């Protein structure tokens, strides 16, 4: 039981420090916040779990950029637009 508690404590501290480095930009969209997180994921091996949880907490917005770890909202597809992977609707891809 004690090793499990130590593990939970380490994971909690590691997640806390990974979010502490992120600036709090109140006016930014969810997309830019998740893009900032994507740059820092190499430092934290638990990042995909943490990033997905944060994205789910911010359910009011939809990411603009996507990757193998950042998913688009329902009804949007991840497409290469001008060399960047973006979440787009079918209508916007057709120019409507």
UniProtKB/Swiss-Prot annotation:
Q: Where in the cell is it found?
A: Secreted
Summarize the PTM comment. Answer: Contains 3 disulfide bonds.
The main location class comes to secreted
Q: State which residues form the propeptide.
A: 17-52
| GO cellular component term of the entry, any | extracellular region
Molecular function (Gene Ontology), one example = toxin activity
Q: Which UniProt keywords apply?
A: Disulfide bond, Neurotoxin, Secreted, Signal, Toxin
Q: Report the protein name in the record.
A: Teretoxin Tgu6.1
Species assigned in the record: Terebra guttata
């Amino acid at each position: 039981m004690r090793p499990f508690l130590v593990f939970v404590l380490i994971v909690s501290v590691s997640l806390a420090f990974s979010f502490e480095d992120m600036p709090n930009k109140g006016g930014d969209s969810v997309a830019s916040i998740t893009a900032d997180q994507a740059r820092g994921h190499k430092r934290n091996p638990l990042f995909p779990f943490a990033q997905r949880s944060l994205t789910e907490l911010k359910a009011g917005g939809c990411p603009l950029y996507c990757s193998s770890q950042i998913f688009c909202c329902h009804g949007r597809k991840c497409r290469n637009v001008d060399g960047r992977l973006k979440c787009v609707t079918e209508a916007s891809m057709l120019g409507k």
